[in-house]
Amino acid sequence: MGMMQEFKEFAVKGNVVDLAVAVIVGAAFGKIVDSLVQDVIMPVVGKIFGGLDFSNYYIALNNQDPNLTLVEAKKLGAVLAYGNFITIALNFIILAFIIFQMVRLLNKLKRTEPPAPEEPAAVPEDIALLREIRDSLKK
């Protein structure tokens, strides 16, 4: 099964254990992923797109000057801060992918463990007695 297909199944119909792992790992790695996106990935993406800072992308909802920073525009009124949304969405995608890889690894480890050998069932007493009678008749 391909990795993208597994990710789709995980995202669409994950179970409670997957969700619990996601919450725990997400809490632990959230700040790391946030730093990765804000300090490493977004500056590179901004450089590719002409030195733009996505965190300051917004649409002014009450005719503010479009050259203001996001903080200044928020002081003057309502803004639609879609640049921040792009950054947070990228954080989510990276975090979800990391969690998916961890769950995928756990599932792979579960599948590779050999099943425990089954102990033979105890022979019922009447069957054991019949076998003894049979064996004594053969002699």
UniProtKB/Swiss-Prot annotation:
One of its GO terms (molecular function) is mechanosensitive monoatomic ion channel activity. It is a multi-pass membrane protein. Its main location: membrane. It is found in: Cell inner membrane. Keywords: Cell inner membrane, Cell membrane, Ion channel, Ion transport, Membrane, Transmembrane, Transmembrane helix, Transport. One of its GO terms (cellular component) is plasma membrane. It comes from the Bacteria. The chain crosses the membrane at residues 10-30, 40-60, 80-100. It holds the Pfam family MscL. The keyword Transmembrane helix applies. Channel that opens in response to stretch forces in the membrane lipid bilayer. May participate in the regulation of osmotic pressure changes within the cell. HAMAP family: MscL. NCBIfam families: mscL (TIGR00220), PRK00567.1-4 (NF001843), PRK13952.1 (NF010557). Belongs to the MscL family. Homopentamer. This is Large-conductance mechanosensitive channel. It comes from Janthinobacterium sp. (strain Marseille). The lineage of its organism: Bacteria, Pseudomonadati, Pseudomonadota, Betaproteobacteria, Burkholderiales.
